Design a protein with these regions (language model features):
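Short linear sequence motif anchored by a di-proline
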Residues: 1-227
Length: 227
C-alpha cells in the first residue's frame, strides 16, 4: 500500500484537535517502512511520528517491519504480533488518499481513492515500541478490511477508514482494560469497509509506482475519465 498526506500541518492540527501546530512537508507517495504521522490519545490527542511497519516487542530484530505494514481487522485482536497493540495502543493515520494496484495484462496499474469532497481520511492503526540495547523504534500497522464495491474491482482489501464520529471511540484509552471479547464487541462495529458512495476513484499514471517519486505528479490522472 501507499498513500498521500499533503494537507498543511496546521489544518491537520485543526481537524484532529491537536494543541500542537504541526509543521510538515507534503508527501504524495508514502511507502512502507517510511516515517508516518499518527494521532494517539495521551491526555488529549497528540501527534506521533513512527515507522510504518510494526515491530513487535518480542522480535529479535526490526527486519520484519516490511511484512507488518497491514493488520487484518478480522484477526488483529488474536494475532500475537498485533493483539497487545490493538488492546492498548490504537492510533489514527491521517491521509488525503490511498493507492491500490490492479493486475491487468501483466502490468500493475495504480488507482487513487479519496473521500468525496476531498475530506481527510483517518486510517485505523495500532502502534508498538521495540527496544534493544538502547535502540528504540516506534512503529505502526494500518488495519485492513474487505474492500467496498468501489475498491473491489481493483483490490480485494482496503485500509480501514474511520468516520470522524468514531475517532474518539477508536482512541478511547478507557477501553484498554476490557477483556478481549468485550473490546472486540466495543470496536467491532467500527471495523467495516468505508461506504463506497462516499468515495471517488480514478486511475493515475504509473509514475507513482516508483517510491522515489514523491511530488504532485503522483496524483495526475491517467488517460481515462474519473468515475
Amino acid at each position: 500500500g501507499r498513500f498521500s498526506l499533503y494537507i498543511p500541518g496546521e489544518k491537520i492540527s485543526e481537524i484532529f484537535g491537536l494543541d500542537e501546530v504541526l509543521r510538515m512537508e507534503p508527501r504524495y507517495n508514502v511507502a512502507p517502512t517510511q516515517l508516518v504521522l499518527t494521532i494517539v490519545e495521551d491526555r488529549g490527542r497528540k501527534p506521533q511520528v513512527v515507522q510504518w511497519g510494526l515491530v513487535p516487542p518480542w522480535a529479535k530484530d526490526p527486519s520484519m517491519a516490511s511484512r507488518m505494514i497491514n493488520a487484518r481487522s478480522e484477526t488483529v485482536a488474536e494475532k500475537p504480533a498485533y493483539r497487545a497493540a490493538f488492546h492498548r495502543r490504537r492510533c489514527l493515520l491521517p491521509a488525503n488518499n490511498f493507492f491500490a494496484w490492479k493486475k491487468e495484462g501483466g502490468k500493475s496499474l495504480p488507482w487513487c481513492f479519496k473521500r468525496r469532497h476531498d475530506k481527510i481520511i483517518a486510517f485505523a492503526g495500532i502502534w508498538e515500541m521495540w527496544e534493544r540495547e538502547g535502540h528504540v523504534i516506534a512503529s505502526c500497522s494500518i488495519l485492513t478490511t474487505d474492500a467496498n464495491d468501489l475498491v473491489k474491482p481493483i483490490h480485494h482489501r482496503m485500509p480501514l477508514i474511520l468516520h470522524e464520529d468514531n475517532w474518539d471511540r477508536w482512541l478511547n484509552p478507557e477501553t484498554n482494560h476490557l477483556p478481549a471479547t468485550a473490546l472486540k464487541k466495543e470496536l467491532g462495529p467500527l471495523m467495516q469497509a468505508y461506504p463506497a458512495d462516499d468515495m471517488t476513484a480514478y486511475r493515475v499514471s504509473e509514475y507513482v509506482n516508483s517510491i522515489h517519486h514523491d511530488d504532485p505528479a503522483c496524483l495526475e490522472p491517467a488517460e481515462m475519465e474519473m468515475f
